A protein has these predicted regions:
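Active-site neighborhood of HAD-like aspartate-dependent phosphohydrolases
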Residues: 1-45
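Asp-based, Mg2+/Mn2+-dependent phosphohydrolase catalytic module
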Residues: 3, 63, 67-84, 92-123, ...
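Active-site flanking residues adjacent to catalytic metal/cofactor-binding acidic residues
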Residues: 7-9, 50, 125-126
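A short alpha-helix capping/helix-coil boundary motif
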Residues: 12-16, 51-53, 85-88, 109-111
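Short, active-site-adjacent cap segments at secondary-structure transitions
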Residues: 13-14, 53-57, 93-95, 130-131
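Gly/Ser/Thr-rich beta-alpha loop segments that engage phosphate groups in nucleotides
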Residues: 20, 56, 60, 127
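Flexible, glycine- and charge-enriched loops at secondary-structure boundaries
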Residues: 22-29, 61-66, 100
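Substrate-recognition element of Asp-dependent hydrolases with the DxDx(T/V) motif
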Residues: 32, 36-69, 81-92
Length: 162
């Protein structure tokens, strides 16, 4: 079984400007490439899990999201970074679906589909809902950006893996 780094997208991979669904709205967070490369060096597979209620709200389409995701993954690949898979929840919060964080649906689906060992995995997010999803799914270590860490890069370089 693999160990993974579950990563929120908005606020971790890219600057969160609210409902980032199009390429022109996307800006990489500082240090993201170095941080992701470090996670790969430590043996983590990268899995992105992202709430995208902007789709349900009509701010952008599923096609816009897929186009942006393809562009983002290409940008990461140019830096030598491969992402195992991107999971997203397109639903509005009031729907009460199982995939939207803080529920653990996306993480549990990834663990099942990709044969991930949750206890030896980590999650990096910027919201309480990210951390709640990780805790509920049984992810071994959960890191919230803001209070203790300013960036994904800081988290990645603070990890001590045996």
């Amino acid at each position: 079984m693999k160990k993974a780094a579950f990563l929120d997208r908005d606020g971790v991979i890219n600057v969160d400007r609210g409902y980032v669904g199009k390429i022109e709205d996307f800006s990489w967070c500082d240090g993201v490439f170095e941080g992701l490369l470090r996670l790969k060096e430590l043996g983590f597979e990268l899995v992105i899990i992202t709430n995208q209620s902007g789709i349900a709200r009509g701010y952008y389409s599923e096609a816009d999201f897929k186009s942006l995701t393809k562009w983002m993954l290409t940008g990461l690949e140019k830096q030598g970074i491969s992402v195992l898979k991107v999971y997203h929840c397109p639903h509005a919060p009031e729907l009460g679906c199982e995939c939207r964080k803080p529920k653990p649906g996306m993480i549990l689906k990834a663990a099942s589909e990709l044969e991930i060992d949750l206890k030896n995995s980590i999650l990096i997010g910027d919201k309480d809902s990210d951390i709640a999803a990780g805790l509920s799914a049984g992810v071994g270590a959960n890191f919230k950006l803001g209070k203790d860490f300013a960036s994904l890069k800081e988290v990645a370089f603070s990890l001590k893996i045996k």
